[in-house]
């Protein structure tokens, strides 16, 4: 099994391996195999379209965690210029699971805040697998208040399995830090756009997710608990994760239907990791459109709209 492909993508992996094999044969022998390769590439595209046309909620959940999926700093590099990272909560420490700083979107100054998971083992440990501690959320809050003072819009990138549940985090006030962020963001006098780029796990995601407009990538998820966690509670077995994912309605498409999500950002065929530059372009277009809408509003109207949005969560449809 190719580790770069999920279990339901293995037919695609096998076909792409054949295409690569033909390319190598053609290069070594000097024989043109372009017609055969072209036919296989067309077959591969149709196969990929067929598989991705009707993904289950559990398969979308797997895609949202794909190890090659672009993370926040990948998008920062592709979308923004003059990024200057800011560190520390001015209280305890700097949490590398939350990255933040000032940057420019085209010529517009913005404040960026988001989760960062890490690629290799060393970085994953340093980033705590994208699970922030209280100091991470307090750093995020400090940067949001700075953005308000300097009249910069806040752009957040959500990608976390959840807030870190360790004893040390609880001792330093994890729940208080999350709750305080919710309160601050609800009244922050600057536009806020949140984009879920991977998995949006529970309060750990919501702590930087209170916003004027919420965007989700096509194969991202947003939920109160992971499918495995839900299955372990309800069925006493994580093997029921597929059923849990379907029941919870965690996908961007389902949340858009419920009115929770404002914009669903289409991903390249096969997911964001198959064409990160194209994905970045789609996100940039969506961010630009959101900021144009929000910055045309009076601030008091924007805050009233944000409050109404918060109060509508969980209301009967």
Swiss-Prot record:
Gene3D superfamilies: 2-enoyl-CoA Hydratase, Chain A, domain 1
MF-aspect GO terms: acetyl-CoA carboxylase activity; ATP binding; carboxyl- or carbamoyltransferase activity
Domain of life from the UniProt record: Bacteria
CoA carboxyltransferase C-terminal domain sequence ranges: 39-293
GO CC terms: acetyl-CoA carboxylase complex
Reaction(s) this enzyme catalyzes, per UniProt: N(6)-carboxybiotinyl-L-lysyl-[protein] + acetyl-CoA = N(6)-biotinyl-L-lysyl-[protein] + malonyl-CoA
Keywords, alphabetical: ATP-binding, Cytoplasm, Fatty acid biosynthesis, Fatty acid metabolism, Lipid biosynthesis, Lipid metabolism, Nucleotide-binding, Transferase
Pathway noted in the entry: Lipid metabolism; malonyl-CoA biosynthesis; malonyl-CoA from acetyl-CoA: step 1/1
Subcellular location: Cytoplasm
GO terms, biological process: fatty acid biosynthetic process; malonyl-CoA biosynthetic process
EC number(s) from the headed UniProt entry: 2.1.3.15
PROSITE patterns, per database record: COA_CT_CTER
Uppermost EC category: transferase
The keyword Lipid metabolism is annotated on this UniProt entry: yes
A Pfam family reported for this protein in Swiss-Prot or TrEMBL: ACCA
Protein purpose: Component of the acetyl coenzyme A carboxylase (ACC) complex. First, biotin carboxylase catalyzes the carboxylation of biotin on its carrier protein (BCCP) and then the CO(2) group is transferred by the carboxyltransferase to acetyl-CoA to form malonyl-CoA.
Family label: Belongs to the AccA family.
Quaternary structure and partners: Acetyl-CoA carboxylase is a heterohexamer composed of biotin carboxyl carrier protein (AccB), biotin carboxylase (AccC) and two subunits each of ACCase subunit alpha (AccA) and ACCase subunit beta (AccD).
Protein name per UniProt: Acetyl-coenzyme A carboxylase carboxyl transferase subunit alpha
Natural source organism: Chromohalobacter salexigens (strain ATCC BAA-138 / DSM 3043 / CIP 106854 / NCIMB 13768 / 1H11)
């Amino acid at each position: 099994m190719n580790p770069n492909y999920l279990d339901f993508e293995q037919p695609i992996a096998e076909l792409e391996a054949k295409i690569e094999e033909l390319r190598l044969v053609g290069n070594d022998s000097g024989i043109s195999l372009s017609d055969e390769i072209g036919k296989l590439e067309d077959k591969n595209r149709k196969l990929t379209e067929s598989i991705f046309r009707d993904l289950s909620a559990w398969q979308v959940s797997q895609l949202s965690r794909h190890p090659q999926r672009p993370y926040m700093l990948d998008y920062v590099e592709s979308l923004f210029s003059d990024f200057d990272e800011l560190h520390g909560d001015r209280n305890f420490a700097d949490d590398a699971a939350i990255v933040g700083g000032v940057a420019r979107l085209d010529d517009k100054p913005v404040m960026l805040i988001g989760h960062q998971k890490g690629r290799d083992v060393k970085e994953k440990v340093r980033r705590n697998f994208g699970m922030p501690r209280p100091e991470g959320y307090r750093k995020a809050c400090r940067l949001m208040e700075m953005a308000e003072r300097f009249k910069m819009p806040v752009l957040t990138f959500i990608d976390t399995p959840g807030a870190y549940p360790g004893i040390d985090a609880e001792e330093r006030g994890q729940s208080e830090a999350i709750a305080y962020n919710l309160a601050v963001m609800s009244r922050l006098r600057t536009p806020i756009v949140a984009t879920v780029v991977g998995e949006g796990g529970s309060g750990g995601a919501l702590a930087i997710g209170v916003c004027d407009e919420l965007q989700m990538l096509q194969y991202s998820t947003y939920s109160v608990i992971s499918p495995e966690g839900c299955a372990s509670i309800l069925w006493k077995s994580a093997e029921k994760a597929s059923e849990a994912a379907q029941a919870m309605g965690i996908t961007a498409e389902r949340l858009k239907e419920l009115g929770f999500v404002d914009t669903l950002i289409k991903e390249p065929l096969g997911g964001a990791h198959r064409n990160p530059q194209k994905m970045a372009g789609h996100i940039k277009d969506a961010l630009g459109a959101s900021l144009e809408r929000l910055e045309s509003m009076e601030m008091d109207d924007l805050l009233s709209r944000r409050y109404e949005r918060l109060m509508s969560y969980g209301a009967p449809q």
